[in-house]
Amino acid sequence: MKTLRLVLGDQLNYTHSLVYTPDADTTWLILETKDETGYVDHHIQKVIGFFAAMYNYARFLEKKGHQVIHIKINDSQNKGSLINNLSNLIQELKIEKFEYFLPDEFRLDERLKQYSNTLSIPVQVWDTEHFLAERATLGQFFEGKKEYLMESFYRMMRKRYGILMDGNGKPLGGKWNYDAENRKKWDAKKKTIPPLLFTHNFTDIALEIEKAQIKTIGSVNAAAFNWPVSRKESLELLHYFVNYLLPQFGTYQDAMSINEWSLFHSRLSFSLNTKMIHPLEVVRAALAAFEKWPEKISLSQIEGFVRQIIGWREYMRGVYWAWMPEFAGLNYFNHQRKLPVWFWNADTQ
């Protein structure tokens, strides 16, 4: 059955089970579209990073033996919007089945559901195989509760995956949370470790974004783009973090400095949010370092990091899906004024 399989820009999972089974009848589709890139003003570094990572993922799939269509933002065959591109390709290629991966955004989830309902061909939806708590698990945890306690969710995840547990159902060290030990102020005299930065010349991508008239915020040195845009680079950044930065991450995870922009943070958010690396492999790498160097990495350090990955990250996703679409319009403090211009352009002088 001739199949079109859509991969969104934040679904670049190099270890997904479907990656290992090339099918001559299935074409993977990677799209750069104006509607999905410009529905809000994204940071220019984010847009460049996504486009570069999507390009690398397309090449990866091709090397694995998959058929891939990668339509760039200014390509002549680009029909402008996600839906227009899908409809055109389904008709042009005489597609008999449409597949896509579960989106992580309510707006896009609804959009693809509605579009699928208009098709006269079968539709299959795949899990992204990324998050530790599937949507069904999230629904069971949050259903019918008046309060969504992160600590309860975090403990459930620790137990479920046996992370920092003593083997008897108890937390390692006797405590679940060492947050009280991870709130030190930054000492300006303390020596820091420089972040691992990559160097990519993406001036061509920046020019394409400008040509497409996509409105963005922020600034970028496109000739020296320093974020990871492949799984290989993401793993390099992970290993750098656990080897050099993790020993002091927890202690200063809430600290800020006007002289140091990254301190001991992993800077893995982009790699995780594009799914180039899996949260469990991130946690396992950190745990391996903790077990290897117990004299360097204290329990409070590793617990502080684990809490961010399997606690806050997974928990906030759960709250999002439990409350959407109402969640998007909540205004607890009843703020009415618009954000000032300097919030977007950083010009405070």
Task: Go through the PLM ranges and name each one.
Residues 1-73:
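N-terminal beta-strand-loop-alpha-helix module at the start
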Residues 161-305:
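Glycine/tryptophan-enriched, flexible segments
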Residues 65-80, 341-343:
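Glycine-rich phosphate-binding "P-loop"
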Residues 267, 272, 277-349:
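Active-site-proximal binding-pocket segments
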